[in-house]
C-alpha cells in the first residue's frame, strides 16, 4: 500500500470558478493562467476543465506544445515571451502569441523568418519594475512593431503590483494612460485581484490565475469568501500513529511543543518533503475526521503531529484534511508566513494526484 497522502482535484469546481470569473468580467475575454504547471495542479490534469476559456497564458514552451498536442486550438499567450531567438521557430509552428518586453526581443522578431505573422502583446512597465518598456517608450515600440512584417494583431499589456489594495491601481493606470495617449489598441491589464476588485481595468482581456484554483490573490481567504470561488485542490492524509502524553512531555524535533496536561497526539503521514510548510507553527489549522483542530510541534520531513483533544474518537486511519474545502490553503499559508500560491506550487512530485 502507498502512503495515504494524496492531492485531490475537483475539476467541476474549476469549471465553476471560471464561470465566476466570467460573471465578474462579463465584457472581457479570459486568458486562463496555467503557469507553474497550473499552479502546481498539473496542466495536463486540469486544462480540459478550463476548455471554455478564450485562451491559455503560461511561460513554458514545452507546456504550450503539450496543449497543442492535446488538441487545444485556441490562443496561447507566452507571458514572458521567447527566451532565445531560436524559440521563434516553435512559436511560428505552434502559433503562439508572444509578449514583447525588451529591445533584444524586438530585434529578434524583426530578423526572424516566419511562415506567418505572430500576434504580439507589448508589455508596459506600470510600476511592478520587473518586465516591460517604460511608459514614455511605449508608443515608439508600438510603431516599430506595427511596421514589422512578422507582427499580426497587437495588444498592450501590463501587470499590476498592488491590485489587491482598494487604491492599488491608480498610479499604474496613470502610467498606462501616459503610455497609450492617442493610441487605439486593445488592452490586457487585469490579474486575479483586478478581475475581482477593479472592473475599470477589465478592458479587452483579463488574466485570472490563482482565483481559478480557488485561493485568494490577497493571501486572505476572507477577501474572496463571498465570491463563490472554491478550492480545487484538497491535500489529505491519515493518522498513522497515536501518542497519549503526560504533562511535561514534548513533541517533535527540538521539543518545541510542551504538553500541559494529559493529551492525545495524532501523527499524520505528511511533512515538508510532501510540500507541507516546514515553518507552520503550533496552532496551524487542520481537519481531523471533519473536526477542526491544530498542528503541534515542528513539522518533520515525512510527518506532522496534531492535537486530538477536539476529536477523541480519532485513531489510526482517521482522515485528515491538510488544506482544501474546509481548511483553506490561504489560512495554512498565513500561519506559516507565506502565501497560498507557494503551497499549491510546492506540492511534491511524490504526492499522488487524483481528479474527480
UniProtKB/Swiss-Prot annotation:
- The catalytic site is made up of 35 (proton acceptor), 253 (proton acceptor)
Q: Which cofactor does it need?
A: pyridoxal 5'-phosphate
Tell me which Gene3D superfamilies the record gives: Alanine racemase, Lyase, Ornithine Decarboxylase, Chain A, domain 1
Q: Which reaction does it catalyse?
A: L-alanine = D-alanine
Residues binding substrate are 130, 301
Which parts of the sequence carry N6-(pyridoxal phosphate)lysine? 35
Ordered alphabetically, the record's keywords are:
Isomerase, Pyridoxal phosphate
How it assembles, according to the record, is: Monomer.
Q: Which PANTHER family does the entry mention?
A: ALANINE RACEMASE, ALANINE RACEMASE, CATABOLIC-RELATED
Return the similarity comment.
Belongs to the alanine racemase family.
The family database entries (NCBIfam families) matched by this protein are listed as:
alr, PRK03646.1
Designated name of the protein: Alanine racemase, catabolic
**The organism of origin for this protein:** Salmonella typhimurium (strain LT2 / SGSC1412 / ATCC 700720)
Amino acid at each position: 500500500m502507498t502512503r495515504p497522502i494524496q492531492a485531490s482535484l475537483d475539476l467541476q469546481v474549476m469549471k465553476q470558478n471560471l464561470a465566476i470569473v466570467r460573471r465578474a468580467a462579463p465584457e472581457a475575454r479570459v486568458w486562463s493562467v496555467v503557469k507553474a504547471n497550473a499552479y502546481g495542479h498539473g496542466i495536463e490534469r486540469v486544462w480540459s476543465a478550463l476548455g471554455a476559456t478564450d485562451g491559455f497564458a503560461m511561460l513554458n514552451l514545452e507546456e504550450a506544445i503539450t496543449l497543442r498536442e492535446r488538441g487545444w486550438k485556441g490562443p496561447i499567450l507566452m507571458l514572458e515571451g521567447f527566451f532565445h531567438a531560436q524559440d521563434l521557430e516553435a512559436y511560428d509552428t505552434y502559433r503562439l502569441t508572444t509578449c514583447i518586453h525588451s529591445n533584444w526581443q524586438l530585434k529578434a522578431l524583426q530578423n526572424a523568418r516566419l511562415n506567418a505573422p505572430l500576434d504580439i502583446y507589448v508589455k508596459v512597465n506600470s510600476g511592478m519594475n520587473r518586465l516591460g518598456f517604460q511608459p514614455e517608450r511605449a508608443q515608439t515600440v508600438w510603431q516599430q512593431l506595427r511596421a514589422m512584417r512578422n507582427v499580426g494583431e497587437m495588444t498592450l499589456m501590463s501587470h499590476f503590483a498592488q491590485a489587491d489594495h482598494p487604491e492599488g491601481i491608480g498610479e499604474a493606470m496613470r502610467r498606462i494612460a501616459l503610455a497609450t495617449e492617442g493610441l487605439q489598441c486593445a488592452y490586457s491589464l487585469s490579474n486575479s485581484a483586478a478581475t475581482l476588485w477593479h472592473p475599470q481595468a477589465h478592458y479587452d482581456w483579463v488574466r485570472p490565475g490563482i482565483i481559478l484554483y480557488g485561493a485568494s490573490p490577497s493571501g486572505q481567504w476572507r477577501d474572496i469568501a463571498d465570491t463563490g470561488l472554491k478550492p480545487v485542490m484538497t491535500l489529505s492524509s491519515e493518522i498513522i500513529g497515536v501518542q497519549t502524553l503526560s504533562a511535561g512531555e514534548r513533541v517533535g524535533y527540538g521539543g518545541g511543543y510542551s504538553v500541559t496536561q494529559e493529551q492525545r497526539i495524532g501523527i499524520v503521514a505528511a511533512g515538508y518533503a510532501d510540500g507541507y510548510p516546514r515553518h507552520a507553527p503550533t496552532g496551524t489549522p487542520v481537519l481531523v475526521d471533519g473536526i477542526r483542530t491544530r498542528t503541534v510541534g515542528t513539522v518533520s520531513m515525512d510527518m506532522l503531529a496534531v492535537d486530538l483533544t477536539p476529536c477523541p474518537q480519532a485513531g489510526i486511519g482517521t482522515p485528515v484534511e491538510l488544506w482544501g474545502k474546509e481548511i483553506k490553503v490561504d489560512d495554512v499559508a498565513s500561519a506559516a508566513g507565506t502565501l497560498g500560491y507557494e503551497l499549491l506550487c510546492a506540492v511534491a512530485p511524490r504526492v499522488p494526484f487524483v481528479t474527480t
